[in-house]
């Protein structure tokens, strides 16, 4: 890697964290006073989502004009189709919480390099927790290095499972809800980061979008966690050049809990 490439690497890592912090401060300016509307798919969007995304995208384009940018809101997709670096923005991950004046939302910024998680920052402006990571450089919560637990799934495990299940609750999820303790925080990015810090033991999300995952994926992976599609196949690299990457079912955990859960998902699927 050339000196110029190393400089760009460090600058992207720093910019992701800096923009997550700035986006979080802007989110607080709208908190409890945001204007809420519904998107065609029925999900919510606020004026904060749009304002934060616009601000972040402008700063990224100014700093790295050759990078591509995609975002959750308003069909954002800019930059070269085959760019080496692709920024993935979720300006308010947890809009349902944010719109109701509840905590449990974050600003999530991910950077993919050749479709693989490269750098990420997830900021919770209520707790002032900044989760950040860069490939090969570790993961951090503010100034504290992160490692997942290695605890197996047990009766006391805390797991997160997205609801509702439009086609009925799969048998493995029914079993988990009987055996484990459910926590659903409303921000997929934060939940993956909670696995990275050892707070959550498992996350199953049957409808995760790329912008839900891209900012937190480097944090989880650099902390020693595992993130795959629910069938165990790799989540990355992402080969879709634009924003039309479809929602997917994902499984995230520490190495032990992920292996246990994947075996249960596989057994349940085979037996159906």
Regions found by a protein language model. Give the residues of each.
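Oxyanion/phosphate-interacting regions
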Residues: 1-13, 18, 193-272
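N-terminal subdomain of lithium-sensitive/metallo-dependent phosphomonoesterases centered on the IMPase/IPPase/PAP
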Residues: 1-92, 263, 270-272
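Residue-level signal for inorganic ion chemistry
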Residues: 27, 49, 60, 95, ...
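Acidic active-site catalytic centers that drive phospho-/nucleotidyl reactions
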Residues: 49, 53, 72, 90-93, ...
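Residue-level detector of anion-binding/catalytic polar loops
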Residues: 66-68, 181, 201, 226
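Short loop/edge segments at beta-strand edges and connector loops
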Residues: 71-73, 143, 186, 231
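Glycine-rich active-site/cofactor-binding loop and its immediate structural neighborhood
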Residues: 83-121
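Acidic beta-strand-loop-alpha-helix segment within the catalytic core
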Residues: 109-193, 239-272
């Amino acid at each position: 890697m050339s000196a110029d490439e190393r400089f760009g690497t460090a600058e992207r890592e720093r910019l992701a964290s800096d923009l997550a912090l700035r986006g979080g401060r802007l989110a607080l300016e709208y908190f409890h006073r945001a204007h809420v509307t519904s998107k065609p798919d029925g999900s919510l969007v606020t004026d904060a989502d749009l304002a934060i995304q616009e601000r972040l995208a402008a700063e990224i384009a100014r700093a790295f004009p050759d990078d591509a940018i995609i975002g959750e809101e308003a069909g954002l997709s800019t930059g070269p189709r085959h760019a080496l670096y692709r920024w993935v923005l979720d300006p308010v991950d947890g809009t349902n919480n944010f719109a109701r004046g509840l905590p449990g939302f974050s600003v999530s910024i991910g950077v993919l390099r050749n479709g693989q998680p490269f750098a990420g920052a997830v900021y919770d402006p209520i707790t002032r927790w900044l989760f950040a990571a860069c490939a090969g450089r570790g993961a951090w919560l503010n100034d504290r290095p992160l490692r997942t637990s290695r605890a197996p799934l047990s009766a006391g495990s805390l797991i997160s499972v997205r609801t509702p299940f439009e086609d009925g609750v799969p048998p493995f999820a029914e079993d988990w809800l009987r055996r484990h303790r459910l926590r659903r925080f409303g921000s997929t990015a934060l939940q993956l980061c909670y696995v990275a810090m050892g707070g959550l033991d498992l996350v199953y999300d049957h409808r995760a979008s790329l912008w839900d995952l891209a900012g937190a994926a480097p944090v989880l992976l650099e902390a020693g966690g595992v993130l795959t599609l629910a069938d165990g196949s790799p989540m990355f690299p992402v080969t879709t050049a634009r924003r039309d990457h479809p929602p997917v079912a994902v499984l995230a955990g520490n190495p032990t809990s992920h292996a246990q859960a994947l075996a249960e998902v596989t057994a349940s699927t085979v037996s159906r």
